[in-house]
A protein has these predicted regions:
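Hydrophobic micro-packing sites on short alpha-helices
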Residues: 1-9, 15-16
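Short amphipathic recognition helices of helix-turn-helix/homeodomain-type DNA-binding modules
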Residues: 11-29
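Exposed aromatic-hydrophobic patches
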Residues: 85-88, 119-127
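Edge beta-strands of extracellular beta-sandwich domains
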Residues: 139-145
Length: 145
């Protein structure tokens, strides 16, 4: 099956379903960015269009970013040496931590990986119109202000 998938340049799931879905050609727009995270290995995939993707045998679904008032997910932003210093008052324990901070601009996206028992601090260029998202170690996706 793997060899057939390579020859046809079609993923195995599409072969098994017997259908090939072609996405309509729409311009990519960072306002439509979608996040896909594997629950097994934590792999993160982003796309500006709906895609069919799998990882570790799991079909991935795009997550809808939720708003939260939880103070541990609210960034504290200060200026430092011509850059933004973004920090979170999150305990960052092994049981729960901020795994990724994602910043989205009109033309680019940046993913910063964070780790348990590490201070939740990121330095970013001073750019206006920045949107931020947090993905937790438990796979929750939050839009943060």
């Amino acid at each position: 099956m793997s060899a057939l998938s390579k020859v046809l340049e079609i993923d195995i799931q599409s072969i098994l379903k017997g259908t090939i879905v072609k996405n309509p050609s729409i311009a990519g727009n960072m306002n439509r960015v979608k996040f896909y995270r594997c629950p097994t290995c934590g792999n993160l995939v982003t796309s500006v269009k709906e895609i069919e993707i799998s990882c570790c045998g799991n079909k991935l679904h795009s997550g809808e970013a939720r708003q939260t008032d939880d103070p541990k997910y609210q960034p504290v932003i200060s200026e430092f040496d011509g850059r933004y210093l973004v920090s979170f008052k999150h305990p960052m324990t092994k049981d729960e931590y901020i795994a990724n901070l994602i910043t989205v601009q009109y033309d680019k996206l940046m993913v910063t990986n964070l780790f348990a028992e590490q201070e939740a601090v990121v330095t970013l260029p001073q750019i206006g119109g920045l949107r931020m998202f947090v993905i937790t170690s438990k796979g929750e996706l939050f839009a943060v202000q």
